[in-house]
C-alpha cells in the first residue's frame, strides 16, 4: 500500500549556484580581504642584493627556490670594501739620474708587482719624496743652464774656407752688406730692359725684307671676306603655295565658290536689330506673306521670330 509522506528537507540543495564573481564579490556586500594580494613587482631591480624581509614576497629581488644567492653588485662592480689605491705622485720624475736603469726597473717590478703609484709605504714614501726633490733640483738646475745658454747672444761664426775641389753650391752662404749708393749713380738701369721701339718682327718667315716696329706698323690689308655664302651653299627659296594662303578649310573663306578641298563657304548673315523683341527689322519681315497654291488651297507663310529668338541654340 502506497502512502504519501510530507518530508521537509532542511539541508541546502546542491543545485544552488555561487554568485557571479564568487562568494567574496563586492556586489553582495561581503567584507574585503585584509591580506594584500601577492603581486610580483616587475619594475624592481635585481642588480643589488635583496633585503631580507619575510613580509615582502614575490617582488623579484629574492632568488628563486633552489638557487644560490648571486651578488650582482660584486659581480659587476667588484667588492664594495676593496682597498683604496693611493694617489700617484705626479711631481716625481720617472727619469733616473746616476742609477742603473735596468736594475732600477727590475727592482721596481719585483717590489710593486708591475704597478707603481708613487707611494709604496711610509719609509718608501719618505725616500721617494726625498729622491723626487733631489731629482727636481737637478732638473731645475739643468733647465736653468739651458735657458741661460739660449738667452746669451749668438756668436758670429767664422766662415770655414772651402776646399779647392768643392763646388760653389756647397760653400756656405755669406751676407754682404751694401753701402750707400753714390750720388752719381742714382739712375739705375735694369740689365734686361730694352727699347720697345727697336723690337721688330716679320710678317712671315719667308719675307725677311719687311720688318716693322711697334711704332710704325703696316696698315690693314685690303683682303676682305665675302659677305654672303659661297654659291655652292646657296639654297633656293621655296615658293609658297597660293592655294594654301588663299583659303581657310574651316570657315570656307577664300575658296572662290568652288568648295574644293574644304568646307563649303558659309554665307554671313547680317542682321541689324534685336532678334528677341524684333526691333530694328524691316516691317515686311514680319508681315510678308507668300501665297502658294497647294491643291487649290492657299497656304500663308509668315516669317515670324522663332520661340527664344534667333540666338537660341535650337536655330
From Swiss-Prot:
Modification Phosphothreonine, positions: 35, 81, 85
An example Gene Ontology molecular-function term: microtubule binding
One biological process term in Gene Ontology: positive regulation of microtubule polymerization
Segments for region (Disordered): 1-37, 51-89, 116-166, 272-315
Positions with biased composition (Low complexity): 120-133
Sites bearing Phosphoserine, chain numbering: 24, 94, 122, 133
Gene Ontology annotations for the cellular component aspect, listed alphabetically: cytosol; microtubule; microtubule associated complex; nucleus; spindle
Residue spans of biased composition, Polar residues class: 1-14, 134-148, 285-296
Regions of compositional bias (Basic and acidic residues) in chain numbering: 62-76
Protein's UniProt name: Microtubule-associated protein Jupiter
Biological classification of the source: Eukaryota, Metazoa, Ecdysozoa, Arthropoda, Hexapoda
Gene: Jupiter
